[in-house]
Regions:
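Flexible, processing/modification-adjacent segments and terminal tails
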Residues: 21-25, 37, 41-42, 54, ...
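Extended beta-sheet lipid-handling architectures
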Residues: 48-50, 64-66, 91, 152, ...
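Positively charged n-region of N-terminal signal peptides that target proteins for export
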Residues: 1-4, 19-20
Length: 217
């Protein structure tokens, strides 16, 4: 179960560390949250291409994967990895399925509070309903160029075990997720600088998605 959970974290989270770009604080956070919620209320489905880049300090180079991303309100998320290997991550209601090499592993979020929180984070981020994350997360809002940057700091001890921070980059035009990143948790009190980054491209909104995409069997 622990191994499966760590695999889940690697699948779900990602980020873009744009440290070289200047960011400025958002002056009216409440207005931004309101705009985000209005935009999110209009979104029923999202489909896009994605690129995942995983950096680990013990590796000589980044591990790059590509695939298809699907989201359906309220709580259905699928990542279909196409290269270099075919594998799937499906979140549907309280269930989560990881499929690779012809083998499936189905987990129940209701039996694992940590997994339930991670599911809430990914659904809130993808659906644009950041306000639903509640007091277990500290949020900071910035802007840079044509993007908003939301820094998400988990306050829950459980979540801190798997993520030190999440950076979420939103397109100012439609508040859709452009990039998303997770910084790995501290190890022995020290930062690892390890992270996973997702880049979302060719997004389509409110297009029909076949129910089989979110099927868990």
């Amino acid at each position: 179960m622990k191994k499966s959970f760590l695999i889940l974290v690697s699948f779900i989270f990602s980020v873009s560390l744009m440290a070289q770009e200047k960011t400025t604080p958002v002056s009216d956070v409440n207005a931004l949250k309101s705009e985000m919620q209005q935009s999110a209320s209009k979104i029923k489905t999202i489909s896009s291409d994605f690129t995942q880049e995983k950096f680990m300090s013990v590796m000589a180079s980044k591990m790059v994967s590509k695939g298809k991303f699907y989201y359906q309100k309220e709580d259905k998320v699928t990542l279909q990895y196409l290269t270099p290997f075919k594998q799937n991550l499906v979140m549907n209601g309280t269930k989560l399925m990881m499929e690779a090499n012809g083998k499936k592993n189905v987990l129940d979020a209701t039996s694992n509070p940590m997994m339930a929180e991670l599911k809430k984070v990914i659904s809130a981020c993808m659906g644009g309903n950041i306000a639903s994350m509640g007091s277990d997360y500290k949020l900071e809002f910035f802007q840079t160029g044509g993007l908003y940057l939301i820094k998400i700091y988990p306050q829950s001890v459980n979540i801190k075990k798997v993520a030190e921070m999440v950076d979420l980059y939103l397109d100012k035009k439609d508040f859709s997720v452009v990039k998303m990143k997770m910084l790995e948790p501290l190890k022995k009190g020290q930062k690892t600088n390890d992270y996973t980054e997702y880049i979302f491209e060719n997004k389509k909104f409110n297009s029909p998605i076949d129910a089989s995409v979110f099927s868990i069997k």
